[in-house]
C-alpha cells in the first residue's frame, strides 16, 4: 500500500541531473551487493515477493492524479523515476502536456547521446509530441489508400519515397531518443518496433537491390497497415488477447491436425482415384472383339480378329468431348460401379479417366489433397459438393464416413476452437475486472491515508471542512469525498467490468490546494464540472433558448400538452401506429397496382404527420433542453427529420436510400418490448467492446485484400482464360481492391474453397493455399470466434435483466386500464341483465361471483399485481428472483425448498407458479399406485351420475375393471410392446416410397399392418382412458400427442374403408402419420430428458429471439424490396440456355416483342427474389446460411431498373447491402441463438442444482465415473515368468521404452501410408509393399514377444486384444487382399485403425496434458451428445417421411438428381443429413418452387398413379425453413452448448494439481512394491516407494523426515495401506484445506465400497506417532543411563578409595546390593592391589599420571561402561541401517 503513496512535499518531480545518475549507480551497487549477500547466505525469495513495477506508472499510462500536476518547467524534459521499482535501474521518465508517462534509458543513445545532449532532448520532444503521432497516423492511412489502388497514377512512385522518408524519420527520432537496442526501453526492445524496422529495411532493400519477384516483396509494404496498431492504444490489448488465444489454441490445433490426418488417411484408403470415374461415351462399334473380350493393349480389332492400332483408347477416354456433362456444370458427371453409386445415362460407360473435379483439386488421390478435402469438410465449406461426388463415386453406404466426420470434426473440433477462444476472452475479462477492483481498493486506502495526513496538517480547522464535505455527500450519494474534499465518482459497475478506470482522471488543477476554504470550493467546482461537462457559455445559451418558460399561460398550456402526450394511451396509440406503419411498409410488392401505391403513399404521409406531431408536442411539453436528454427522443427526432427531408426531396433521383430511414421506426418498439430492447443492448454492448476488434478485423481484411491484389492480381488478368470460358474476369477475382476485399470477406464467411480453386488455377497452388489458409485460420476461426465469445459474454448477467426502468412501461399501464374497463363493463351488463330477468336467487351469487370474478380478473390481468401476498419461502414472483442476484439466493432457496417442500405456500397467492410440465410427468409416474378419478370435480358436480360408489355393485365391478386396466398399462411388458409397435409403425412408413406401386405384395402387407397398428394404438388409448381417467390422461402433454396421432390414423383408416383415400384433404392428413415417431420421445428416457428439460425450457427464449430476428430481418427485407423489387427479371433463351445481352434485349418490352416470333424466349424472374417481403425473408435466410446467396447477390449486383434486362455488375456497390446484412443479420442474430441456448442451459442447470440436464441418471453415473477414477484399487501385476529367457523378454516388453518405440513405428507406418498416391509407379508400389510387409513383421514380432512374456495374461488387457486382431487382419490382408477388397473394405484400413493406439502414449508424455483434456472433454460429452444425436435422427426421420410423401416426384434439376431426391427413404435421409448443417438446401428447394411452364403438372410418372412433377412452393418453403430452424439453429447449437460446458469442466479438472493420470501412475508404481495386491507395503520400503513415484506425488530422497511429518497411519506389522498413503501424498500436493477433507471422505467411501477388506485392518499408530514414541523412549533411556552412570561413578570412587586406602571413606558404601554393587564387586573383587601399575586407560591430568584399576572382565565392561554413557551423535555418513536405536 505504502508503495503507492507518493512522497509528500513539492519535490515529487525532480529533474534528471548528473547527481541523479550517480545516485542511480550507488543504488545499483547496493542492490548488487545485497543480492550477492543473499546468494552467499542461500536466501531464496519467492517469485510473488519479488518487487514489481507499479501498474499505474507504466509507460503509456496517464500520471495518477494523486501526484498532482508536474510544474510546467518539468514537462517534456527528463525527470527522475517515480516508480520505486525502477529507482535502482538506469531509467528516467518524461511527462508530456497530457500527463502521459514515457520511459527512457539513461545510457547514452547510440553510445554518444547522453540524456543531457540537446539532440537527444530535441528527439524526445518530437517523439512525445501529439502532432508527431498524428502525422504518422495520417501517413499510414494515406499510404494504405495508395496501396489499395490497383492502377496507381505515375506520380505515386514519388509519394512512395516520401512515405519511406517519413517512416525513416520516425525511426531515426525513436533511435535518437531511445537508443538502438542495448538496454531496456530502447528502440528494438519493443516488439512493435521490429515491424517498423522490417518495413523500412524492405523498402530500401527492394529499392537498391534487384531481388527478382518484386510484387511478392512489395506486399511487405502492407505490413505498414499494422503500424496503426502501434499508434492506436486500445488495439495493442486486443491484439494481445488474440495472440493469447492463438497460444491457447495450440492444443486444439494439434488435435485437429492429428484427427484430420487420420481421417485423411481413411479417405485416402477408401476413395483413392474414385473421383476420376466419369461417364464416357461408349467407344465406336468394332473396337472390341466379337466375344466382347477387351484386349489388354487396347488396340482396335477388326472383324476378322487381326489387331489394328489406329484406335487410340487412352486418347479417346481422356478426350473431354466424350464425357457426359450435366447442363450448367463445368465438370463431367461422376459415377461409380457399385450397386448404390451414381449411374450413367444410356449410351455411356463408367470409366476412370481424365482429371479430378474442380480443376483437379477435389480428390483423395494423395495425402495432401485428401487432407484439404477433409479440412473443407470440417469447416463445412461447400461440403455438399464433396459429399455428393463421393457418394456418387463410391456408394451411399459411405454416408457413415461423412456422419462421423461432421459430428466429430465439424461439430466437435471447430466448436472446441470456439470454446478455447471464449475461455481466453473470459479469462482476460476476469483479469481486467480483478485489476480494476484491486486498484479501486488501493486508491480508497490511499485516500484514507491522505485524509489522515490532511487532518493532521490542518488540525482543528478540519472540522468545518469535513462537515461541509459530508453535507455534500449527503446531498449526492453518488459522490465520495476524498482527502481534500474533492468529489470523486466511484467506479461504476460497468466501468469496472470494462476496465475503463476513470478514477484517476479528476482535474488535477484542484489537487494539493493550500487552504481549506479553497479545498472546499474546489470540491464544489469539481462536482459542478463533473455534472456539467460543457463550457459555461453553453448553459447560458440553453437557459435562454432551450428552456421555454416565458409566461404563465404558456406554462399552463405546456402542462395540458404534457398530460396529453405523456399519457399511457397516447403511448399505446403511437405503438399501434408504429406497428401499422411497419405493416404498410411491408405491404409493398411487385407488381403493385396504382391504387395500392396511392394508398401506401397516403399512409406514409399520415404516419409521418403523426410522428412529427408527437415530436412537436413532446418538444412543447418537455422543452428542447429536457427532450434531448432522453436517448429515445433523439432517435425519434432523427427519424422524423429524415422522413420530412425524404418528403421534400421525393422527386430527386437516387435518394431512395432515405426511404430506408423510415424502417428504423421499427426499433421504437424496443421501448416497450424488453427482448428487442435486450437484443439491441447486447448488440450495443458488443459493438462497444467490438470497436477495437472490428478495427483489428478491418486491418486484417485490408492487409489480406492488398496482399491478394499485389500477389495474384496480375495472374488473374494474365491467366483469366483458365477459369473463364469467355476470357472475361469472373465475379470473384483479385485484380482490384474492391473485389479482393469481397473475396476476403467471403472467406471470413466460411466460403474459401471455390475462390481458392480459381486462385490456384491462375496463380499456382503453393502461395494461394498459404494465403487462403492464413485468412481462414486467423480471420474466420480466431477473430470471428472472438466475436462470438464477446456476444456470449454480453449475454451474461446484467444485460439479460429486463428494461432499465424497473417500473412497468406505459404500454402495460394502458393495457391494464383497458382490461379493467372491459371487466367493469362485463360486470355491469351482467348485473343489469340479471335484474331485468328477475334472477333473484342468484343475485347474491352474482354479487359474489360476478363482481368478485371481475375484480379477480382485473387483478390477474393487470400486469402489476395489486395484491401483495405474503410469499412462502421457496416461492418467487418470477424466474429471476425479482432482479435480485440469483447467486446469493440460490443456496438459501434450495434449503428452504428442501425443508418446506412447498407446504407453506400461501393458498390465495395469485402469484403461485404453476407446476411445470416435467414436474407433472414426474408426479404421475411416481405417485400413481392406483387409478385416480376419471373426471374433474366440476364434471362430477354438473353430472352427479358420474359419481359412482366403488364399494359395491356395478361401481365395484367398474373399479376392479379399472384396476385391471391400470395394472396392464403400468406393466413393463405393455410399455415394451407399445414401443415395439411404435418402432414398427414408424419403420413401415419408410417403405412407402415411389416404388410401392410396383411392389404389390409389400403394399398389401403395409395396408394390413397400418390397420393393425391403428387398432393397437386405439386399444392402448382406451386402456389408458379407463386406467388413468380422462383427468390424468388429458392433463399430460405426452398423452395429448398420442391422442392426436391416433386420431390421424383413425381418420385415414376410416377414409380408406369408405373409399375416400384419394381425397386431397385425406392425402394431406396421411402425411401427418410421419409424426408417429414422436411418440417414441416420451418412451425413451434419454430423449425425453433432452426434449423436456432442455428444449421445452428453451422454447420461450428461442421463440423470443426468433421474433426479434424476424423484426430485425424485416427491416432488411423491406429495404431489399425497396431496392430490388421487380429488378431480378431477365430475358432468357431456353434452347441455348443463355441470358440475352442488354444490347440485344434492353427491357421487358423488347423481350415480349422477341417472344412473339420465338417461342423459346421467356421473360423470367429469379426463383428467389425480393418482389415482396415474404420472398425477401426467404432470400435473406439463404444469404444468412450462405447457401444460394451467390445467385441472389449476382442478381442484385446486375440489376438496373424495374423490368430492365440485367447488366454484368451494373450495380456493383449493392454488395455492401449484403455485407451489412451478413454482419448484423447473420453474425449477430444467428449467434444469438447459441447465446440464448447456452444461457437457458445454464439457467436450467441452476434450477436442477447444477446437475447436467442432457443426461439420464444412468448416464450421470458414467459421467461421474469418468470424472473421478480415484476409486481405483491396486491390481495384481502380471507375475514375471520363472523361465530365464521368458524373464528377459518380459523385462524387455514391460519397459516404457518398448511402448514408445512401438508408437514411433506406428507413426512411421502411417507416414509410409501417406506416401501412397493414386498414380504411383509400379516401383514405388513395390517398395511400399515391402515396407508395409516389414511393418507387419515388426508388429507380429511385437505380438509374439508379448504373448511369450505375458502368457495367457496377454489377453487380459484390452489394448493387446486390439493389437492382436489388427495383426491377424493385416496378415490376412496380405494373403487375401483381393478377396477382402471385393467383398469388404480395403484391408489397408486396418492399419489406420492402429492409430487409436496413440491414445495410449499420450499418458506418457507430460506435454500432451492439454490434448488429454480435450479428449477427456469429448468423453464427458458423449452421453449427452448421443441423446442429442438421437433427437436429431428423430427429426431427420420425420422430415424424411414427410419429404417422401410430398416431394417424391419433383422434377430433377439443380440440387435434385438421381442420388439426391425424396424418392426413397434412404435418399431422403441423405438429403436431410446434408441440410442439418444447412448445406445445399437451396438446391433442393429450387425444383420444389417450380410452377408451370418450368414443370409439367400432367406428366406421367412411370410405375405410379401420381401425375405431374411440380412441387408445392408453400409447403416446400415451410418444410425447409422449419427444418433449418430446428436442426441447424437449435439442435446443433445444443451441441455447442454441451461442448462449451464440458470443455470448461474438463479444463477445471485438468487445472487441478492432481489428475487421473497421477492416480494411475501411483497404482502402477504400487504394483511393483506390492506384487500380491495385498494393498499394504512395509514401512521400511516407504522411503524408496515415495522416491520412485513421478511428480507431482513424488517425494525425493532424503525423505525420511518428510514422511514422518506426514503422519501416515500404520497397521499391525508395521505396514502402510495404499489409500492412506495416497491420501497423505494428495494432501501434500493440495495443501491442507476443507477441499482436502471432502476429498478424503469421498475417496474413503469409494475405496470401502470397492474393497471391503480394508475394514479389518484398523490403524494402530502412524509414522509421526512411531517417531514420537521412539524419541520418547530414547529420552527416558538416556536420562536413566545418566542416573545409573552417576551412581556407578560414586560407587567406583568409594570402592577405589576403600581398596587403595588413599583416603578412608567416611560412612557406608552408596550401593550395597543390586546390579551396580554386584558388577562393581566382580570388577574390583576383594583382593588387594597386585602391582603399582594397574591396567586401564591412563591419562595425564595436571601433569600427574593416574593409575587405572585392574582390567575388569569383558561382560562388566560392556554392560556398565558402554551402556552407561550417552552415545556421541553419529556422523552423517553412518548408514541408516547400521544406526543403533539409542542414537537420536
Swiss-Prot record:
Membrane topology: Multi-pass membrane protein
Disulphide linkage map: 279-335, 344-350, 721-727, 759-768, 1131-1151, 1495-1510
GO biological process: membrane depolarization during action potential; neuronal action potential
Listed CDD domains: Na_channel_gate
Limits of the IQ domain: 1669-1698
Keywords: Cell membrane, Disulfide bond, Glycoprotein, Ion channel, Ion transport, Membrane, Repeat, Sodium, Sodium channel, Sodium transport, Transmembrane, Transmembrane helix, Transport, Voltage-gated channel
Reactions this protein catalyses: Na(+)(in) = Na(+)(out)
GO molecular-function terms, A-Z: voltage-gated sodium channel activity
Sites where a glycan is attached: 213, 291, 304, 337, 1133, 1147
Positions annotated as IV repeat: 1278-1575
Side of membrane Extracellular, spans: 150-156, 210-215, 272-366, 392-398, 588-598, 653-654, 708-736, 758-768, 992-1004, 1057-1064, 1122-1173, 1196-1212, 1316-1326, 1376-1388, 1443-1464, 1488-1516
Segments of this protein annotated with the region Important for rapid channel inactivation: 1253-1255
Protein known as: Sodium channel protein type 4 subunit alpha B
Encoding gene, per UniProt annotation: scn4ab
Amino acid at each position: 500500500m505504502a508503495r503507492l503513496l507518493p512522497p509528500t512535499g513539492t519535490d515529487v518531480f525532480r529533474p534528471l541531473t548528473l547527481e541523479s545518475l550517480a545516485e542511480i549507480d550507488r543504488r545499483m551497487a547496493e542492490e548488487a551487493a545485497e543480492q550477492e549477500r543473499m546468494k552467499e547466505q542461500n536466501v531464496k525469495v519467492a517469485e510473488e515477493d519479488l518487487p514489481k513495477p507499479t501498474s499505474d506508472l507504466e509507460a503509456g499510462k496517464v500520471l495518477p492524479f494523486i501526484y498532482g500536476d508536474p510544474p510546467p518547467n518539468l514537462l517534456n524534459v527528463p525527470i527522475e523515476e517515480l516508480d520505486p521499482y525502477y529507482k535502482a535501474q538506469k531509467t528516467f521518465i518524461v511527462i508530456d502536456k497530457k500527463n502521459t508517462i514515457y520511459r527512457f534509458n539513461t545510457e547514452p543513445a547510440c553510445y554518444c547521446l547522453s540524456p543531457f545532449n540537446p539532440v537527444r532532448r530535441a528527439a524526445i520532444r518530437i517523439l512525445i509530441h501529439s502532432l508527431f503521432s498524428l502525422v504518422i497516423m495520417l501517413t499510414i492511412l494515406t499510404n494504405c489508400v495508395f496501396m489499395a489502388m490497383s492502377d496507381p497514377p505515375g506520380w505515386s512512385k514519388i509519394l512512395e519515397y516520401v512515405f519511406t522518408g517519413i517512416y525513416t524519420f520516425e525511426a531515426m527520432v525513436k533511435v535518437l531518443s531511445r537508443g538502438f537496442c542495448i538496454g531496456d526501453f530502447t528502440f528494438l526492445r519493443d516488439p512493435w518496433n521490429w515491424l517498423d524496422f522490417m518495413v523500412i529495411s524492405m523498402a530500401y532493400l527492394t529499392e537498391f537491390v534487384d531481388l527478382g519477384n518484386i510484387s511478392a516483396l512489395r506486399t511487405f509494404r502492407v505490413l505498414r497497415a499494422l503500424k496503426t496498431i502501434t499508434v492506436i492504444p486500445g488495439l495493442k490489448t486486443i491484439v494481445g488477447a488474440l495472440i493469447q488465444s492463438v497460444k491457447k489454441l495450440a492444443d486444439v490445433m494439434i488435435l485437429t491436425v492429428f484427427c484430420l490426418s487420420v481421417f485423411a488417411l481413411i479417405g485416402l484408403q477408401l476413395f483413392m482415384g474414385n473421383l476420376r470415374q466419369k461417364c464416357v461415351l461408349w467407344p465406336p462399334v468394332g473396337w472390341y472383339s466379337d466375344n466382347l473380350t477387351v484386349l489388354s493393349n487396347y488396340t482396335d480389332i477388326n472383324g476378322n480378329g487381326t489387331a489394328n492400332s489406329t484406335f487410340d483408347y487412352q486418347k479417346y477416354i481422356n478426350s473431354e468431348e466424350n464425357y457426359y456433362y450435366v447442363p450448367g456444370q463445368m465438370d463431367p458427371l461422376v459415377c461409380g460401379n457399385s450397386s448404390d453409386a451414381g449411374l450413367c445415362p444410356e449410351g455411356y460407360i463408367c470409366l476412370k479417366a481424365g482429371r479430378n473435379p474442380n480443376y483437379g483439386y477435389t480428390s483423395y488421390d494423395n495425402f495432401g489433397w485428401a487432407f484439404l478435402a477433409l479440412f473443407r469438410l470440417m469447416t463445412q465449406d461447400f461440403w455438399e459438393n464433396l459429399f455428393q461426388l463421393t457418394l456418387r463415386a463410391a456408394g451411399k453406404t459411405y454416408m457413415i464416413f461423412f456422419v462421423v466426420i461432421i459430428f466429430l470434426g465439424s461439430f466437435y473440433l471447430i466448436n472446441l476452437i470456439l470454446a478455447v477462444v471464449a475461455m481466453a476472452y473470459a479469462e482476460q475479462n476476469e483479469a481486467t475486472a480483478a485489476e480494476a477492483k484491486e486498484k479501486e481498493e488501493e486508491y480508497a486506502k490511499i485516500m484514507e491515508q491522505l485524509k489522515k495526513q490532511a487532518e493532521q496538517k490542518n488540525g482543528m480547522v478540519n472540522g468545518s471542512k469535513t462537515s461541509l464535505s459530508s453535507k455534500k455527500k449527503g446531498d449526492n450519494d453518488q459522490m465520495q469525498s476524498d482527502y481534500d474534499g474533492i468529489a470523486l465518482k466511484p467506479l461504476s459497475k460497468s466501468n469496472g467490468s470494462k476496465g475503463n478506470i476513470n478514477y484517476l482522471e479528476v482535474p488535477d488543477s484542484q489537487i494539493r490546494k493550500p487552504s481549506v476554504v479553497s479545498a472546499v470550493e474546489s470540491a464544489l467546482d469539481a462536482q459542478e464540472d463533473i455534472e456539467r461537462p460543457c463550457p459555461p457559455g453553453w448553459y447560458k445559451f440553453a437557459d435562454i433558448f432551450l428552456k421555454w418558460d416565458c409566461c404563465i399561460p404558456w406554462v399552463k398550456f405546456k402542462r395540458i400538452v404534457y398530460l396529453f402526450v405523456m399519457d399511457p394511451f397516447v403511448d399505446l396509440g403511437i405503438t399501434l401506429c408504429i406497428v401499422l406503419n411497419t405493416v404498410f411498409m411491408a405491404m409493398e410488392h411487385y407488381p403493385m397496382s396504382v391504387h395500392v401505391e396511392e394508398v401506401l403513399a397516403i399512409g406514409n404521409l399520415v404516419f409521418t404527420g403523426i410522428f412529427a406531431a408527437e415530436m412537436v408536442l413532446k418538444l412543447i411539453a418537455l422543452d428542447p433542453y429536457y427532450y434531448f436528454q432522453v436517448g429515445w427522443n433523439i432517435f425519434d427526432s432523427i427519424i422524423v427529420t429524415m422522413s420530412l427531408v425524404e418528403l421534400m426531396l421525393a422527386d430527386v433521383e437516387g435518394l431512395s436510400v432515405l426511404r430506408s430511414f423510415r424502417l428504423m421506426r421499427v426499433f421504437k418498439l424496443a421501448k416497450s418490448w424488453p427482448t428487442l430492447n435486450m437484443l439491441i443492448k447486447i448488440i450495443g454492448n458488443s459493438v462497444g467492446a467490438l470497436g477495437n476488434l472490428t478495427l483489428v478485423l478491418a486491418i486484417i481484411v485490408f492487409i489480406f485484400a492488398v496482399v491478394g491484389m499485389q500477389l495474384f492480381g496480375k495472374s488473374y488478368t494474365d491467366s483469366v482464360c483458365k477459369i473463364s470460358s469467355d476470357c472475361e474476369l469472373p465475379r470473384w477475382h483479385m485484380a482490384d481492391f474492391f473485389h479482393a476485399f469481397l473475396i476476403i470477406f467471403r472467406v471470413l464467411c466460411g466460403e474459401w474453397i471455390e475462390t481458392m480453386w480459381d486462385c490456384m488455377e491462375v496463380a499456382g497452388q503453393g502461395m494461394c493455399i498459404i494465403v487462403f489458409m492464413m485468412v481462414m485460420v486467423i480471420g474466420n476461426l480466431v477473430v470471428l470466434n472472438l466475436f462470438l465469445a464477446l456476444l456470449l459474454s454480453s449475454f451474461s448477467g446484467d444485460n439479460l435483466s429486463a428494461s432499465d426502468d424497473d417500473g412497468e412501461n406505459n404500454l402495460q399501464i394502458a393495457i391494464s386500464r383497458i382490461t379493467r374497463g372491459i371487466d367493469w363493463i362485463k360486470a355491469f351488463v351482467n348485473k343489469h341483465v340479471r335484474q331485468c330477468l328477475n334472477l333473484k336467487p342468484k343475485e347474491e351469487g352474482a354479487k359474489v361471483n360476478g363482481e368478485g370474478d371481475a375484480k379477480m380478473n382485473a387483478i390477474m390481468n393487470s400486469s402489476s399485481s395489486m395484491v401483495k401476498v405474503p410469499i412462502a419461502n421457496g416461492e418467487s414472483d418470477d424466474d429471476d428472483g425479482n432482479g435480485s442476484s440469483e447467486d446469493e439466493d440460490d443456496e438459501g432457496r434450495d434449503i428452504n425448498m428442501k425443508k418446506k417442500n412447498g407446504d407453506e405456500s400461501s393458498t390465495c397467492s395469485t402469484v403461485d407458479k404453476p407446476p411445470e410440465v416435467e414436474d407433472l410427468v414426474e408426479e404421475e409416474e411416481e405417485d400413481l399406485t392406483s387409478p385416480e378419478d376419471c373426471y374433474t370435480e366440476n364434471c362430477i358436480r354438473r353430472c352427479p351420475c358420474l359419481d359412482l360408489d366403488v364399494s359395491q355393485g356395478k361401481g365395484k365391478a367398474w373399479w376392479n375393471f379399472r384396476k385391471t386396466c391400470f395394472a396392464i398399462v403400468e406393466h413393463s411388458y405393455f410399455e415394451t410392446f407399445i414401443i415395439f409397435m411404435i418402432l414398427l409403425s414408424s419403420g413401415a412408413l419408410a417403405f412407402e416410397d415411389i416404388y410401392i406401386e410396383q411392389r404389390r405384395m409389400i403394399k398389401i402387407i403395409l395396408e394390413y399392418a397400418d390397420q393393425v397398428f391403428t387398432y393397437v394404438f386405439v386399444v392402448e388409448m382406451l386402456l389408458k382412458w379407463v386406467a388413468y381417467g380422462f383427468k390424468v390422461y388429458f392433463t399430460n402433454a405426452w398423452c395429448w400427442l398420442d391422442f392426436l396421432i391416433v386420431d390421424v390414423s383413425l381418420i385415414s383408416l376410416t377414409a380408406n374403408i369408405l373409399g375416400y383415400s384419394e381425397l386431397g384433404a385425406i392425402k394431406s392428413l396421411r402425411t401427418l402419420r410421419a409424426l408417429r415417431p414422436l411418440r417414441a420421445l416420451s418412451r425413451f428416457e434419454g430423449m425425453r430428458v433432452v426434449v423436456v428439460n432442455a428444449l421445452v425450457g428453451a422454447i420461450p427464449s428461442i421463440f423470443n429471439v426468433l421474433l426479434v430476428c424476424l423484426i430485425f430481418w424485416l427491416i432488411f427485407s423491406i429495404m431489399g424490396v425497396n431496392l430490388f423489387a421487380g429488378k431480378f427479371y431477365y430475358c432468357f433463351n431456353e434452347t441455348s440456355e443463355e441470358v440475352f445481352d442488354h444490347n440485344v434485349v434492353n427491357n421487358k418490352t423488347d423481350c415480349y416483342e422477341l417472344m412473339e416470333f420465338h417461342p423459346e424466349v421467356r421473360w423470367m424472374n429469379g426463383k428467389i427474389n425480393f418482389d415482396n417481403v415474404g420472398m425477401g425473408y426467404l432470400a435473406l435466410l439463404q444469404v444468412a446460411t450462405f447457401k444460394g446467396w451467390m445467385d441472389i447477390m449476382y442478381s442484385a449486383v446486375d440489376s438496373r431498373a424495374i423490368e430492365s434486362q440485367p447488366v454484368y455488375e451494373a450495380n456493383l456497390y449493392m454488395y455492401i447491402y449484403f455485407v451489412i446484412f451478413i454482419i448484423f443479420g447473420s453474425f449477430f442474430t444467428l449467434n444469438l441463438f447459441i447465446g440464448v441456448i447456452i444461457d437457458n442451459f445454464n439457467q436450467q442447470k441452476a434450477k436442477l442444482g447444477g446437475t447436467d440436464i442432457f443426461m439420464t441418471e444412468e448416464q450421470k453415473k458414467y459421467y461421474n465415473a469418468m470424472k473421478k477414477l480415484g476409486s481405483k484399487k491396486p491390481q495384481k501385476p502380471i507375475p514375471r515368468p520363472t523361465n530365464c529367457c521368458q524373464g528377459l523378454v518380459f523385462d524387455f516388453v514391460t519397459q516404457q521404452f518398448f511402448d514408445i518405440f512401438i508408437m514411433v513405428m506406428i507413426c512411421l507406418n502411417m507416414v509410409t501410408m501417406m506416401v501412397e498416391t493414386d498414380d504411383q509407379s509400379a516401383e514405388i508400389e513395390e517398395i511400399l509393399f515391402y515396407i508395409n510387409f516389414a511393418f507387419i513383421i515388426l508388429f507380429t514380432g511385437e505380438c509374439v514377444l508379448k504373448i511369450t512374456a505375458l502368457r495367457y495374461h496377454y489377453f487380459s488387457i484390452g489394448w493387446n486384444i486390439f493389437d492382436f486382431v489388427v495383426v491377424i487382419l493385416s496378415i490376412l490382408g496380405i494373403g487375401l487382399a483381393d478377396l477382402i477388397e471385393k467383398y469388404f473394405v480395403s484391408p489397408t484400413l486396418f492399419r489406420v485403425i492402429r492409430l487409436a493406439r496413440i491414445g495410449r502414449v499420450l499418458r506418457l508424455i507430460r506435454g500432451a496434458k492439454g490434448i488429454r483434456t480435450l479428449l477427456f472433454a469429448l468423453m464427458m460429452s458423449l452421453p449427452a451428445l448421443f441423446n442429442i444425436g438421437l433427437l436429431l435422427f428423430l427429426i431427420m426421420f420425420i422430415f424424411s417421411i414427410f419429404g417422401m410423401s410430398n416431394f417424391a416426384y419433383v422434377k430433377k434439376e439443380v440440387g435434385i438428381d438421381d442420388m439426391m431426391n425424396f424418392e426413397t427413404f434412404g435418399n431422403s435421409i441423405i438429403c436431410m443429413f446434408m441440410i442439418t448443417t444447412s448445406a445445399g438446401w437451396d438446391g433442393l428447394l429450387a425444383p420444389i418452387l417450380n410452377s408451370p411452364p418450368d414443370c409439367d403438372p400432367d406428366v406421367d410418372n412411370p410405375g405410379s398413379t401420381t401425375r405431374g412433377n411440380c412441387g408445392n412452393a408453400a409447403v416446400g418453403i415451410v418444410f425447409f425453413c422449419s427444418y433449418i430452424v430446428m436442426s441447424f439453429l437449435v439442435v446443433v447449437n445444443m451441441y455447442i452448448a454441451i461442448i462449451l460446458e464440458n470443455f470448461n469442466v474438463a479444463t477445471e479438472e485438468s487445472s487441478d494439481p492432481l489428475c487421473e493420470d497421477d492416480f494411475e501412475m501411483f497404482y502402477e508404481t504400487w504394483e511393483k512394491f506390492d506384487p500380491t495386491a495385498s494393498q499394504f507395503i512395509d514401512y521400511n520400503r516407504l522411503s524408496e516407494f515415495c522416491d520412485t513415484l513421478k511428480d507431482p506425488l513424488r517425494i525425493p530422497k532424503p525423505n525420511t523426515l518428510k514422511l514422518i511429518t506426514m503422519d501416515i497411519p500404520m497397521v499391525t506389522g508395521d505396514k502402510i495401506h495404499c489409500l492412506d498413503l495416497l491420501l497423505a501424498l494428495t494432501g501434500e500436493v493440495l495443501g491442507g484445506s476443507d477441499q482436502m477433507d471432502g476429498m478424503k471422505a469421498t475417496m474413503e467411501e469409494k475405496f470401502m465400497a470397492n474393497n471391503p477388506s480394508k475394514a479389518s485392518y484398523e490403524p494402530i499408530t502412524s509414522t509421526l506417532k512411531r517417531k514420537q514414541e521412539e524419541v520418547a523412549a530414547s529420552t527416558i533411556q538416556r536420562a536413566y543411563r545418566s542416573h545409573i552412570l552417576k551412581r556407578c561413578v560414586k560407587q567406583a570412587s568409594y570402592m577405589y578409595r576403600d581398596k587403595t586406602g588413599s583416603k578412608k571413606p567416611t560412612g557406608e558404601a552408596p550401593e550395597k546390593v543390586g546390579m551396580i554393587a554386584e558388577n562393581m564387586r566382580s570388577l574390583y573383587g576383594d583382593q588387594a592391589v597386585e602391582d603399582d601399575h594397574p591396567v586401564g586407560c591412563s591419562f595425564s591430568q595436571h601433569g600427574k599420571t593416574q593409575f587405572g584399576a585392574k582390567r575388569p572382565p569383558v561382560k562388566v565392561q560392556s554392560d556398565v561402561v558402554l551402556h552407561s554413557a550417552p552415545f556421541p551423535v553419529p556422523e552423517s555418513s553412518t548408514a541408516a541401517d547400521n544406526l543403533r536405536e539409542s542414537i537420536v
